Every structure is written in C-alpha cells, then in structure tokens.
A protein has these predicted regions:
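Catalytic cores of glycan-processing enzymes that make or break glycosidic bonds
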Residues: 1-197
Length: 197
C-alpha cells in the first residue's frame, strides 16, 4: 500500500548511488520485497539475484533456470545460505524433488552429492540466460571429490541467525595445490567454454 512512497524514495537515492560508480549494480531481491522493487530495478537497469531453490514465484518449489532474466546474476548459494552440498543433504525430500523436476532424473537422488551431480547442476547454471553466473568456491570444489572438503558442514560461511557463527570458512587448500589440480581446471574450463561464459 506504500509502494508509491517507497518507489519515490528509491528514485531519489538510488540514481545518485548508481551514477557514483562504474560498477554493475545487483540487488539482493530475495524473499519478501515490496511490489515496487522490480519497477525500480527495471527502470534503473539493476541486476536481480536468481537462486534456483529460492524462486521469486511463490507457487514454485524451484525456479526454472531457462526463465532467468538476462539482467540477472545467477548463483547456487551465497555467503548467508547453505552451500550446494549442504542444501542437498539437509532436506532429502526437497533434493529428490529437485533431482526429479529440475534435473529430470527418475531414480533415487544420491546422498551425499557426488561430483558428477555437482558438475551437472553447475553446468545448468552456467547455461542459463543470466548475464552473470557467480558461484562460491565451495560449489566449484564440490565437482571434484578429491579436492572438496570431506565435511560439507565446514563449508558454511555465515549463519545470519547465529551471532557466534560468522565468516568462518577458510579454504582448506593452498593456491599452489589448486593451481596444480589439472583435472579440476580442465573440467571447469570445458564447462565454461561449452556454455560460452
């Protein structure tokens, strides 16, 4: 009911902020947002954030990646959410629905998440129409069972509801080992090249 008010407030402030930088602006427009937010974002050409398991359409369990708007950033997880592997194992019923409805597989969803499945999910995100696909290091590493952390729970960066659990994640590999992981590098290069990212 206050959409016009918030729209006017946004249009007073946001254009100045956007004009102050050459950066591409992205909004974290997840969850309950006022109806005016998409109007403002469209008018100011602000990219939306698209997370498949947090769809903006309330009647959907999972967003359809092929319907992501071009003016968006797609990701699988963020610093405030469970990583891909954690999400997969937190709710087996939800994972099975994703496995069936989004990945179009009829058998039982494997647990814990194998590397081939992580690669499939990442490939689908890379292939979506979003302008940018930005994934966490943990989600990239999930594709390689030799490189990823054994304990998926240790990959969590931040739990907003827990003031004692904040920004804890530290990469368990040193950069030299990551650079030397040729199979991992070639796999990622192949996916990026095939999806023309």
């Amino acid at each position: 009911r206050n959409n016009q008010y918030w729209y006017c407030e946004a249009m007073k402030k946001l254009p100045r902020l956007i004009d102050a930088t050459r950066m591409l602006v992205c909004a974290e427009d997840l969850g309950m947002v006022p109806d005016c937010v998409p109007w403002v974002m469209n008018e100011l050409k602000i990219l939306s954030l698209e997370i498949q398991n947090m769809p903006k359409e309330t009647n959907l369990r999972f967003g359809n990646l092929s319907h992501n708007p071009y003016r968006s950033v797609c990701t699988i997880s963020s610093h405030d959410t469970a990583t891909m592997r954690m999400w997969w194992d937190e709710d087996c019923e939800q994972a099975q629905a994703d496995y069936r409805d989004s990945l179009y597989r009829g058998d039982a969803a494997p647990h814990p998440m194998p590397g081939w499945l992580a690669r499939d999910i990442i490939f689908r995100h890379l292939a979506c129409p979003s302008m940018l696909c930005i994934l966490t290091l943990q989600d990239w590493l999930a594709t390689d069972e030799k490189l990823r952390l054994a304990d998926a729970e240790a990959e969590r960066i931040n739990i907003p509801a827990n003031p004692k659990h904040y920004w804890r994640y530290r990469m368990h590999l040193n950069l030299e080992d990551l650079l030397a992981a040729d199979d991992f590098t070639h796999t990622l290069q192949g996916m990026i090249k095939e999806t023309q990212r």
